[in-house]
Regions:
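Gly/Pro/Ser/Thr-rich low-complexity, intrinsically disordered segments predominantly at protein N-termini
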Residues: 1-210
Length: 210
């Protein structure tokens, strides 16, 4: 049986890969290799298709429940963002170093949309990152947590669709790439978001998953 490069990568025998940089990735979009808005993320220098599917569905499928929860989060957070002097971005990249440009489902960033007319937000701009996960749950708990914790994002929310729970990660540790505190919120509970500039917002988990 023939051996592919992927087999060699998993076995640790492949030659070194050359990572794609954020600048190169953005140039690909400008050159029309990818369309702006395509569900492609740059993770550790590799191009990765963003998984918005339900478990058992094809990766290209956009799970309707995933889309619904993103819309609800947008509605819940919009007014609080304006009061906090923040800007809400939906499924738009952020830049975390030279080889990472993930596309969170929801990102709360400091400032206004005009502040990002010529650039994507970086680590110093980020208040809250949110991923809505079904089949991508494992990746969002591991890879995405590592990226966001390393970047020092104060809070990371993982919307767990299969179990109708909201996982809240706080106290990022850049050295370990993990958050020191994790709490799980279910129906009947509320989640507090404490932006650094204003009063907190209490989000009902029941309303989110109804």
């Amino acid at each position: 049986m023939s051996t592919t490069l992927l087999d060699e990568l998993s076995g640790g025998t492949a030659p070194p890969l050359v990572p794609i940089t954020v600048e190169q990735f953005q140039q690909m979009i400008l050159n029309g290799i990818f369309q702006d808005g395509d569900p492609i993320e740059l993770i550790d220098g590799l191009l990765v298709r963003k998984d918005r599917s339900a478990r058992g569905e094809h990766l290209m499928t956009h799970n309707p429940r995933h889309a619904l929860l993103v819309s609800r989060l947008q509605r819940f957070l919009m007014s609080a963002c304006e009061a906090a002097g923040c800007y809400l971005r939906i499924q738009i990249p952020v830049v975390l170093g030279s080889i990472n440009a993930p596309e969170p489902d929801v990102a709360v960033v400091r400032g206004t949309e005009e502040d990002y007319a010529d650039r994507h937000p970086g680590p110093a701009d980020l208040e809250l990152m949110i991923e809505v996960a079904d089949s991508s749950l494992g990746t969002d708990r591991s890879t995405k947590q590592r990226l966001y914790a390393t970047a020092g994002v104060p809070q990371y929310w993982l919307v767990n669709l299969p179990e109708s729970q909201l996982e809240v990660y706080e106290q990022p540790d850049a050295a370990t790439g993990k958050y020191a505190r994790k709490t799980i919120h279910a129906a009947g509970q509320t989640v507090a978001w404490n932006p650094s500039t204003t009063q907190r917002l209490d989000l009902s988990v029941t309303d989110l998953f109804r």
